[in-house]
Structures are given as structure tokens and as C-alpha cells.
């Protein structure tokens, strides 16, 4: 189970009670907004980890500058992931954040990897899906996780969608597939 630290502060015990568990697998600081003392956050996360309340901790929506600040702090490099918006139509992190995380061996967690209903109606995704015998959603997810350093967390409303999405794990997009998607949804320019 995962949960995010919001405006109410670090409270995995409260979150655990709400979720019906005594520990969280991953606890995220959701936005840095106004937090100048990241060392206090890291110390709190490390204390929660040592107490067995959380198995890992990470951040959400941190840019490269925020990540550099975090990694300058003792134990800041124990951050398990950075959860950010990433999908075939929202590729801004490819410019700097994705390479930064890859260089440090830290996976990126992509939220909204399916990009919403309009992206799932994208003709390029549909064509590629038809060629591979799968859904546009499976293509979008396979695209998101193609580097091996991205974890996609799609929302799913049914068991059927979960099964459909799982196809992405065994789907290998061809260079032509990737070129077709780049033509419609170009990567950011450096």
C-alpha cells in the first residue's frame, strides 16, 4: 500500500488506520510546496522506516532542482522513487528529470500513464494496439515502461481493465511503433 503526505504532515499511523494496515509499503511526500527543511522530512521518513511503519519513502512532483536538494541531505539518496505525471502525451520529464533519475538508479513512478480518455482514443495508439492484438491502453503503458526505469500506476475501474493493462508487461514496441508515437506526440526539445 502507498499513501502520500499532504498538508496534514507525516502521519503514516493515521494513514495506516484509514487503510486498515499497520505499515505502508511506500510513503510519499506529495509536492514540496513551501517545505524549506527537507532534512526534517528525511529524518522523519527514516525514523518511520526504522520503526517499521513504512517500508520505503519517496517524493512526488519534484523537479531536478528539488531532487538535487534532497540528495545533498544525509540519507536523501534513500528516496525510493519520484512520482510524476508521465505519458506519451506528457513527456516533459524526458528533458532532464528522467535522465537524472536513471543516472542514479532511481525509478520514476508515472501517474496518469494512460493520459485520460482522449489519449486512449488516439488513432496511433489504436493502430499499434490492433497490430499487436491489444488495447490502446496496453500500448500506452508499454510505451511508459519501455526504458525499464519507469513504474506505471494506471487507474483501473474493473478486473477486466487490470487484465487488459497487464498485457503491457509482455508487449515490446517496435522501433516503427515508437517512431509513429513520436511523430504524433514528440519528445521535448532540449
Where do the PLM segments sit?
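CE4/NodB-like, metal-dependent polysaccharide N-deacetylase domain
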Residues: 7-28, 47-51, 73
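Beta/alpha (TIM)-barrel catalytic core signal, keyed to glycine-rich beta->alpha loops juxtaposed to Asp/Glu
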Residues: 32-190
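Short, acidic/polar
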Residues: 4-19, 40, 65-69, 94
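Active-site mouth loops of central-metabolism enzymes
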Residues: 1-6, 30
Amino acid at each position: 500500500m502507498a499513501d502520500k503526505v499532504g498538508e496534514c504532515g507525516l502521519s503514516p499511523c493515521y494513514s495506516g488506520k484509514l487503510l486498515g494496515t499497520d505499515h505502508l509499503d511506500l510513503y510519499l511526500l506529495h509536492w514540496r510546496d513551501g517545505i524549506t527543511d527537507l532534512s526534517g522530512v528525511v529524518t522523519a521518513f527514516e525514523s518511520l522506516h526504522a520503526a517499521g511503519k513504512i517500508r520505503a519513502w519517496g517524493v512526488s512532483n519534484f523537479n531536478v532542482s528539488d531532487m538535487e536538494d534532497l540528495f545533498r541531505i544525509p540519507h536523501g539518496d534513500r528516496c525510493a522513487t519520484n512520482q510524476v505525471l508521465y505519458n506519451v502525451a506528457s513527456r516533459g520529464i524526458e528533458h532532464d528529470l528522467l535522465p537524472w533519475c536513471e543516472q542514479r538508479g532511481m525509478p520514476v513512478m508515472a501517474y496518469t500513464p494512460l493520459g485520460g480518455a482522449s489519449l486512449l482514443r488516439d488513432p496511433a495508439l489504436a493502430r499499434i494496439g490492433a497490430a499487436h492484438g491489444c488495447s490502446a491502453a496496453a500500448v500506452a503503458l508499454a510505451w511508459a515502461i519501455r526504458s525499464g526505469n519507469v513504474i506505471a500506476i494506471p487507474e483501473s475501474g474493473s478486473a477486466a481493465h487490470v487484465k487488459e493493462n497487464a498485457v503491457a508487461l509482455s508487449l515490446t514496441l517496435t522501433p516503427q511503433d515508437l517512431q509513429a508515437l513520436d511523430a504524433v506526440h514528440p519528445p521535448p526539445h532540449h
